[in-house]
């Protein structure tokens, strides 16, 4: 019978993974790396990544501002602008209560 020994493996996020089983260890490390990659992608300002899928409540819009108003879905600024423009023309957006006030920008005031 082969002797199992615990081999510590240091992952790039500073965690030390110790598992006696080599394959499980490899899988665990892959998972950690994958999580790190996803987190890096999410946390990059301007990623516009929908963080709600990962159970994270806040998201960055692509213009670099934190967007946490709509908890269910982190919308991109493009979608928000579309909503705003729709309201400008008199058609209501998805939800009356969540309607965005049109900002005074020449782009939106064009007819």
Curated annotation (Swiss-Prot):
Keyword set, alphabetical order: Early protein
Source organism, top-level taxon: Viruses
Biased composition, class Basic residues, residue ranges: 99-111
Positions of the UniProt region annotated as Disordered: 82-111
Note: A protein has been genetically mapped between the loci 0.6 and 0.7. Two open reading frames exist in this region, 0.6A and 0.6B. Protein 0.6B exists due to frameshifting that occurs prior to the TGA stop codon of 0.6A.
Protein name: Protein 0.6B
Organism: Escherichia phage T7
């Amino acid at each position: 019978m082969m002797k199992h020994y615990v081999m510590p493996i240091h992952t790039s996020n500073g965690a030390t993974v110790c598992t006696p089983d080599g394959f499980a260890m490899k899988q665990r490390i892959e998972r950690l790396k994958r999580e790190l990659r996803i987190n890096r992608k999410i946390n990059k300002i301007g990623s516009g990544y929908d963080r709600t899928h990962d159970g994270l409540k806040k998201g960055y819009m692509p213009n670099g501002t934190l967007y946490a108003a709509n908890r269910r879905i982190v919308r991109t600024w493009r979608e928000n602008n579309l909503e705003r423009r729709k309201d400008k023309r008199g058609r209501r957006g998805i939800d009356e209560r969540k309607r965005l006030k049109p900002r005074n920008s020449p782009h939106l005031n064009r007819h």
